[in-house]
């Protein structure tokens, strides 16, 4: 008899349920639900482009619809399938995406007084309203608690837990004062499923706490009350409602509550794993192991690595955290990333590409890629910075913006499109160089996510720029697959057949395709990358005082040489 697990994947605009066969990793059915609230699921503010909130009611509706529909499909596709053979559920979400709740764990936006109040909703990962608070946290911790910053790259981000909560206290003191606690949605959703939403009893994820909330066992868990209160009066009160322990997603949050079991048609014996972020579970779904860099390439990109925790690992400036157990037990999880990748391409197509490339967005993307793929590296004479949504790694600065150099009166849209793709590849190489600079060897790169699977030009450019093979994960839904794997492991060996993640990964993950670097392309990209590096440091760092006089001229020289070779 086959056994199954469900992976629940909560993304920026939608959620999905994936049902996986535990014996071989076959993804037998899935269903996607687009969040109905706001604009594509995000509650925005036309007067403040930094705001990005989410309605948690969308998650609850999404759980019910996607699981029921996935089960319905599974019954059709697999004749002997029964929902009673589902033994585990894993949950991944975006993050840091904290939610203000009352003492029962009820979201404040569910209370009539705060209904439709964005401050009482989920503060989505890409909400950048708290950039000032993030800077002040960095300054304060640097002076009085430097250890708090040492394992998160040296800089606190506006995308993270404490900066958002602090900003909430200024933006809407009434909401802040009504909040008993702020709970990451990767913690709240499993708590809802098991029927234990008391903030004092929720099992908080080490993934979220360690990477985004300055949690470490070295100083007793979350930041101390004195430090928090020194930032802003009132912040310290929240510390009393945060436990001193955080949990790996390999552990069980509890069993599916009777209410949810009845609603979904499942057993109350279904194990629900502790939650984690989508990238970290996606890395497991992509088969991460020591020496493997997993890139989850989508609207943004998150890079994940692991390193054995029985060996000393140096702090790495500019990364989003080095956290013991955030990906797998026995390993430090290393997180880095780029704030926008697919979102840059989407912005360009939505706003700047003329209709000669197509009438619909899909036609424009298709024709742009066909035209851009015919170009040689350097042929356009363009160089871009991939900072349209700020820089996450290695500069950790949301106040940086995009840039395109080298345009002339003859520059074509597909040339700009390729330059934007190349910019994201240069950003990826910058992260690789930083990680290896601090002693972590990268033996292979595995890519997953929609862009990695669908855009062969992008993956070939990444291979050429980095001079490394780019492997593509077998699964097109790696975060959901990773969540299902965690759900299975949380059920225990006697139930699921797996006692740890490594054994589950071997049976349930794999590689579908590999892009090999082309040496002649790499040689040109080395020249372009040196210019990118100069521009990157000149605009992104205080210390760099390099002269940019030759950048445009060198771009033209590279362009002319490539075009001359094409004619020959």
Regions found by a protein language model. Give the residues of each.
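Conserved phosphate-binding catalytic cores of ATP/NTP-utilizing and phosphoryl-transfer enzymes
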Residues: 1, 76-79, 257-266, 276-292
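Phosphate/pyrophosphate-binding loops at sites that engage ATP/ADP/AMP, CoA/4′-phosphopantetheine
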Residues: 66-86, 172-175, 227-239, 264, ...
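Conserved active-site beta-strand element of glycosyltransferases/polysaccharide synthases
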Residues: 295, 304
């Amino acid at each position: 008899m086959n056994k199954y697990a469900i992976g629940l994947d909560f993304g920026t605009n939608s959620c999905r349920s994936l049902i996986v066969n535990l014996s071989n990793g076959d993804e037998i059915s899935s269903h996607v639900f687009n969040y109905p609230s706001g604009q594509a699921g995000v509650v925005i503010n036309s007067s403040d482009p930094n705001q990005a909130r989410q309605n948690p009611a969308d998650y609850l509706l999404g759980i019910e619809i996607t699981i029921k529909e996935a089960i319905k499909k599974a019954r059709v596709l697999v004749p002997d399938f029964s929902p009673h053979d589902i033994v585990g559920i894993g949950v991944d979400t975006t993050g840091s995406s904290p939610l203000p709740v009352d003492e029962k764990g009820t979201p404040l936006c569910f209370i009539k007084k705060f209904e439709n109040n964005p401050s009482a909703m989920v503060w989505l990962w890409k909400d950048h309203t708290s950039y000032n608070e993030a800077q002040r946290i960095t300054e304060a911790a640097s002076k009085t608690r430097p250890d708090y910053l040492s394992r998160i790259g040296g800089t606190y981000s506006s995308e993270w837990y404490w900066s958002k909560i602090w900003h909430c206290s200024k933006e809407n003191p009434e909401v802040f004062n009504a909040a008993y606690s702020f709970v990451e949605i990767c913690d709240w959703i499993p708590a809802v499923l098991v029927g234990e939403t008391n903030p004092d009893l929720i099992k908080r994820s080490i993934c979220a706490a360690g990477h985004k909330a300055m949690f470490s066992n070295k100083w007793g868990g979350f930041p101390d009350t004195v430090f928090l209160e020194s930032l802003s009066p009132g912040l310290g009160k929240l510390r009393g409602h945060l436990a001193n322990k955080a949990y790996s997603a390999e552990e069980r949050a509890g069993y599916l509550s009777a209410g949810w079991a009845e609603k979904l048609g499942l057993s109350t014996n279904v194990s629900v794993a502790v939650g984690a972020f989508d990238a970290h579970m996606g890395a497991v779904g992509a088969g991460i192991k020591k020496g493997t860099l997993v890139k989850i390439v989508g609207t943004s990109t998150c890079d994940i690595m692991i390193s054995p925790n029985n060996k000393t690992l140096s702090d790495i400036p500019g990364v989003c955290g080095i956290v013991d157990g955030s990906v797998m037990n026995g390993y430090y999880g290393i997180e880095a990333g780029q704030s926008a990748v697919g979102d840059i391409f989407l912005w360009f197509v939505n706003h700047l590409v003329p209709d000669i490339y197509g009438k619909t967005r899909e036609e424009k993307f298709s024709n742009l890629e066909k035209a851009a793929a015919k170009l040689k590296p350097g042929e356009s004479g363009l160089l871009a910075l991939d900072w349209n949504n700020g820089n996450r790694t290695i500069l950790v600065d949301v106040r940086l913006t995009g840039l395109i150099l080298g345009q002339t009166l003859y520059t074509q849209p597909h040339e700009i499109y390729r330059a934007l793709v190349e910019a994201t590849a240069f950003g990826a190489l910058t992260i690789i160089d930083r990680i290896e600079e601090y002693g972590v060897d990268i033996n292979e790169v595995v890519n997953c996510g929609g862009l990695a699977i669908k855009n062969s030009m992008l993956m070939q450019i990444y291979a050429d720029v980095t001079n490394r093979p780019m492997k593509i994960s077998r699964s097109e839904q790696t975060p959901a697959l990773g969540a299902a794997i965690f759900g299975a492991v949380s059920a225990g060996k006697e139930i699921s057949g797996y006692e740890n993640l490594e054994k589950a990964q071997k049976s349930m993950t794999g590689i579908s395709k590999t892009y090999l670097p082309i040496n002649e392309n790499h040689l040109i990209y080395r020249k372009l990358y040196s210019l990118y590096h100069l521009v990157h440091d000149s605009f992104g760092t205080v210390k760099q005082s390099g002269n940019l006089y030759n950048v445009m001229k060198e771009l033209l020289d590279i362009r002319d040489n490539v075009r001359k070779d094409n004619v020959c």
